[in-house]
Swiss-Prot record:
It is a peripheral membrane protein. Zn(2+) binds at C56, C61, C80, C83. One of its GO terms (cellular component) is endoplasmic reticulum membrane. The gene is SEC232. One of its GO terms (molecular function) is zinc ion binding. Component of the coat protein complex II (COPII) which promotes the formation of transport vesicles from the endoplasmic reticulum (ER). The coat has two main functions, the physical deformation of the endoplasmic reticulum membrane into vesicles and the selection of cargo molecules. This is Protein transport protein SEC23-2. Belongs to the SEC23/SEC24 family. SEC23 subfamily. The COPII coat is composed of at least 5 proteins: the SEC23/24 complex, the SEC13/31 complex, and the protein SAR1. It is found in: Cytoplasm; Cytoplasmic vesicle, COPII-coated vesicle membrane; Endoplasmic reticulum membrane; Golgi apparatus membrane. It holds the Pfam family Gelsolin.
Length: 757
C-alpha cells in the first residue's frame, strides 16, 4: 500500500488501513485504529467549489455529498454512506451526466467557498513585556514593526505593555499618548474591567458592542484598523523603553504576565467574542507578580525544575497552572488564540501557560533572546503568505468527524479544544486524548497543524464477513470549517473509506502503516506523560510493543534467533526505542519550559516531521562516496566523513577528526583541493534546504570531533560502542549507560518468543 500517496491526496494517514470487523478483534491489534489528519494540507490541484456544500438531511448526520454517495438520477436523489438516509439533490444537479459530474462527486477532498462573508477582519493584539534589557527590547521592536507590514491593512490592532503595571493603549488618540493603567497584582473580573474602561455596567455596554461601531466609550476603541493606526503604533514602538521600575540587587524585575493576559483576554471577550483574534505575548522572563506568579522576585529562589514539580516542592506551580488553565478555557470558548514567544535565557513559565496555546492552535516558541535569528525568522514565518498573497494562517476553525455506524470516536490529540455535543451518536465511552465529542474547535489553524484522531470499532463481537463490498466499508468524513485570510468562510471536506475484515486476514497485517502508528502511539505517550509518571509511560510503551510483536512477528517459541518481522513492521521497534530516549519522555536534562516547548511542537506536526523528532536523520558526506543516509549510531562517526544531523529542533554539521584537521590547515583555500572545498560546502547546502520552510526555525550547529557542541550529536546516537565496550574498539565511544538498540532488540526478541505478557 502506498500510504504517502493517500496522505498527498487527502492529508490522512491511518495506523491500520484495513480495519478489523469487531471491537474485540481491534483490541487484539494492540495499536489502536487511528489517523493523522492535516486539514489544511497543501494538496496539488485541490478542487475549490464556489458554492455551499450539499448537506445530508439526517438530523444527527449532516454529512456532505461525496464520491461514496449512491446517486439515483431518475429520482434525483442521493444516499448518504454515513447514515444511509435518502436525500433530494438540489435543482442545479438535474443535468448531471457521467461526463459532467460535479467535483464533489469526483474528488475525495474538496474545498468550498461559502456565500457567507466574514463581517469583521482578524484582530492582532500585541502584549509586550517591557522588563527586557534595552538591546533585547530594541530587537523585539524591530521584529514587531516588520510584522506589521505583513498583516492585512484592514486587520484590527491592539497594543498593551506590562512590567510592574499593565498599560493598555488607546490607539484612536492621535494627538497625545493615551493609555489605561492597571495594577499588575490584581486579578480583574470581567464586570470590573468593562466598568473601568467604559464607565458603564456590562449590561449597558454589550448592546452597542455587538454592532461593531466604535465610540469613545466602547471597548472596541482599543482595536482599530492597521491602515488607520500604523503610524501611531510605529511611534509607540520606537519610543518604547525598558520598564523604569527599579529592581533591587539580587532580585528579578516585577513582571505582571498573568494580569496582562487576564486583561487582554477579558477585553477581547467583551467586544469581539467568537471573532478571529490572536493575542501575541512577548515574554522576557517569568511572571513574578500574582496572579500567574511563576517564581518569587528574589534570585536566591530558583525557578522550579521537573524534580521540584514531581516531588511537590514547586510552591507556585499548581496555583499558576490553575490560573492559566482558566484563561485557556475562556480563550478557547471565545474562539481566540494565544501565542507565547519567549526571548530570554531563563524560563518564563511555558509549562504553566502551555494550555493557552495548545487548546487554541497558538504558537509556543522558546528562544534565548529576541535578537536571535531563531526568534526573528520564526516569528515572521507566523505571517507567511500563500501564492495569492494571503496569510496561510486561518481562524475560527471547527473540525467535525462523521463516521458510519461501524466506527465511534475515542478522541483527538492535537492543538484543539472539545465542543461538547450531546446529540452525537458516534462517540465512544472510552477516551483517548480530548474525547466525549465528535467536534473540536481550533481557534487558529495553519498548513502545519496535524491532529491525531482515534477510533473504536462499534461492533462488540466478531461478525461473519458480508460479501458485498459496500457493507464491508467503514466511512469517515472530516469537515473543517474556517475563516480564510481573504475574508471568506470556507469548508474543506475529506471523505475516506476503509475495508473491514475479520481478524487474522492477511490484508489487515499488510495494511499496517508503521510510521503513522509510531507517531500516533507517541502522541498517546506524550499525552499520558502530562499526568502520569514517566517510568509508567515507558513501561506502557514497552508492553504494547511486546504484545504487537507477539501478534505479528514470525517466530518459534523460545527461539529468539527465529524472530522475524514483516517489512512494514520491522522499523516499529526502533521507533519505540528512540521515542523512549527522546526529550518528549526522558526529561532529565530539560527544564519544564523546554519539555512544554518540545511536546507542543511534536503534537502539531505531520508524520514525516514527527518521525524526524523521534528518530533524527543522519547523512554522511565523504570524498569517496556520494551523500547517503547512515545509521543513527556511533559506528557512523568516522574520521574521514562529515555528518549532517537533523533532529527537527536543530541541524548539526559534524566534521570528523581528519576532516577537521584539514579544515584547520586551510586546505579548502588551496585550488588544488577544490574537491575538499566542495565537500565542506555540500552539507551546508543541504542544511540550508532543510531550513527553508521549517517552523520554528531550527538551531544551526557547526562542530567537529572533540568540539564542545559535539555532545549534541553523541547524545542522539545509538551507543553501539560505549565505555563498557572500549576493549572491542570502535569508531567513537559514547559515554552513556543507555541500553543500545542491539541490546533492546535482543531483549524484545527474548521476551516475545517466551510468551511473557
Amino acid at each position: 500500500m502506498d500510504f504517502e500517496a493517500n496522505e498527498d491526496l487527502n492529508g490522512v494517514r491511518f495506523s491500520w488501513n484495513v480495519f478489523p470487523s469487531s471491537k474485540t478483534d481491534a483490541n487484539k491489534n494492540v495499536v489502536p485504529v487511528g489517523c493523522l489528519y492535516t486539514p489544511l494540507k497543501e494538496i496539488e490541484d485541490l478542487q475549490i467549489a464556489s458554492y455551499n456544500p450539499v448537506v445530508c438531511a439526517g438530523p444527527q448526520c449532516k454529512a456532505i455529498l461525496n464520491p461514496y454517495c449512491a446517486i439515483d438520477p431518475r429520482s434525483s436523489s442521493w444516499t448518504c454512506p454515513i447514515c444511509n438516509s435518502r436525500n433530494h439533490l438540489p435543482p442545479q444537479y438535474a443535468n448531471m451526466t457521467q461526463e459532467n459530474m460535479p467535483i464533489e462527486l469526483q474528488q475525495t477532498t474538496v474545498e468550498y467557498i461559502t456565500n457567507k462573508p466574514v463581517q469583521i477582519p482578524p484582530i492582532f493584539f500585541f502584549v509586550v513585556d517591557i522588563t527586557a534589557e534595552q538591546e533585547n527590547l530594541d530587537a523585539l521592536k524591530e521584529s514587531i514593526i516588520t510584522s506589521l507590514s505583513l498583516l492585512p491593512p484592514n486587520a484590527l490592532i491592539g497594543f498593551m505593555t506590562y512590567g510592574n503595571v499593565v498599560q493598555l493603549y488607546d490607539l484612536s488618540c492621535d494627538i497625545i499618548e493615551r493609555c489605561s493603567v492597571f495594577r499588575g497584582d490584581r486579578e480583574y473580573q470581567f464586570d470590573q474591567l468593562v466598568e473601568m474602561l467604559t464607565g458603564q455596567k456590562p449590561s449597558n455596554t454589550m448592546a452597542p458592542l455587538a454592532n461593531g461601531k466604535i465610540t469613545p466609550l466602547s471597548l472596541n476603541r482599543f482595536f482599530l484598523p492597521l491602515e488607520q493606526v500604523e503610524f501611531k503604533l510605529n511611534q509607540l514602538l520606537e519610543s518604547m523603553s525598558p520598564d523604569q521600575w527599579s529592581v533591587p540587587a539580587g532580585h528579578r524585575p516585577l513582571r505582571a504576565t498573568g494580569s496582562a493576559l487576564n486583561i487582554a483576554t477579558l477585553l477581547l471577550q467583551g467586544c469581539y467574542k467568537n471573532v478571529a483574534s490572536r493575542i501575541i505575548l512577548f515574554a522576557s522572563g517569568p511572571g513574578t507578580v500574582a496572579p500567574g506568579l511563576i517564581v518569587n522576585t528574589e534570585l536566591k529562589d530558583p525557578i522550579r525544575s521537573h524534580h521540584d514539580i514531581d516531588s511537590d516542592r514547586a510552591p507556585h506551580y499548581k496555583k499558576a497552572c490553575k490560573f492559566y488553565n482558566s484563561i485557556a478555557e475562556r480563550v478557547a470558548e471565545n474562539g481566540h488564540t494565544v501565542d507565547v514567544f519567549a526571548g530570554c535565557y531563563d524560563q518564563v513559565g511555558m509549562s504553566e501557560m502551555k494550555k493557552m496555546t495548545d487548546s487554541t492552535g497558538g504558537v509556543l516558541l522558546l528562544t534565548d533572546a529576541f535578537s536571535t535569528a531563531i526568534f526573528k525568522q520564526s516569528y515572521l514565518r507566523l505571517f507567511s503568505k500563500d501564492e495569492e498573497g494571503y496569510l496561510t494562517m486561518v481562524f475560527n476553525g471547527n473540525l467535525a468527524v462523521k463516521t458510519s455506524k461501524d466506527l465511534k470516536l475515542q478522541g483527538l490529540i492535537g492543538h484543539a479544544s472539545a465542543v461538547k455535543k450531546t446529540d452525537a451518536t458516534n462517540v465512544s465511552d472510552s477516551e483517548i486524548g480530548i474525547g466525549s465529542t465528535s467536534v473540536w474547535k481550533m481557534s487558529a489553524l495553519s498548513p502545519h497543524h496535524t491532529y491525531g484522531i482515534f477510533f473504536e470499532i462499534a461492533n462488540p463481537n466478531a461478525v461473519s464477513p458480508i460479501t458485498t463490498d459496500r457493507a464491508n466499508l467503514a466511512y469517515t468524513q472530516f469537515i473543517t470549517q474556517y475563516q480564510h485570510a481573504s475574508g471568506t468562510n470556507r469548508v474543506r471536506v475529506t471523505t475516506v473509506a476503509n475495508q473491514m475484515l475479520p481478524f487474522g486476514t492477511p490484508a489487515i497485517a499488510a495494511s499496517f502503516d508503521q510510521e503513522a502508528a509510531a507517531v500516533l502511539m507517541a502522541r498517546i505517550a506524550v499525552f499520558k506523560a502530562e499526568t502520569d509518571d514517566g517510568a509508567d509511560v515507558i513501561r506502557w510503551l514497552d508492553r504494547t510493543l511486546i504484545k504487537l510483536c507477539q501478534k505479528y512477528a514470525d517466530y518459534n517459541k523460545d527461539d529468539p534467533a527465529s524472530f522475524r518481522l514483516a517489512p512494514n513492521f520491522s522499523l516499529y521497534p526502533q521507533f519505540t526505542y528512540y521515542l523512549r530516549r527522546s526529550q518528549f519522555l526522558s526529561v532529565f536534562n530539560n527544564s519544564p519550559d523546554e519539555t512544554a516547548f518540545y511536546r507542543h511542537i511534536f503534537t502539531r506536526e505531520d508524520t514525516t516531521n514527527s518521525l524526524i523528532m523521534i528518530q533524527p536523520t543522519l547523512t554522511s558526506f565523504s570524498m569517496e562516496e556520494d551523500p547517503q543516509p547512515v545509521l543513527l549510531d556511533s559506528i557512523s562517526v568516522k574520521p574521514n566523513t562529515i555528518l549532517l544531523l537533523d533532529t527537527f529542533f536543530f541541524i548539526l554539521i559534524y566534521h570528523g577528526e581528519q576532516i577537521a584537521q584539514w579544515r584547520k590547515a586551510g586546505y579548502q583555500d588551496d585550488p588544488q583541493y577544490a574537491d575538499f572545498k566542495a565537500l565542506l560546502e555540500e552539507p551546508k547546502v543541504e542544511a540550508a534546504e532543510l531550513l527553508v520552510d521549517r517552523f520554528p526555525l531550527p538551531r544551526f550547529i557547526d562542530t567537529e570531533a572533540g568540539g564542545s557542541q559535539a555532545r549534541f550529536l553523541l547524545s542522539k546516537l545509538n551507543p553501539s560502542d560505549n565505555y563498557q565496550d572500549m576493549a572491542r574498539g570502535g569508531s567513537t565511544i559514547v559515554l552513556t549507560d543507555d541500553v543500545s538498540l542491539q541490546n533492546f532488540m535482543a531483549h524484545l526478541q527474548q521476551v516475545t518468543v517466551s510468551g511473557q505478557p
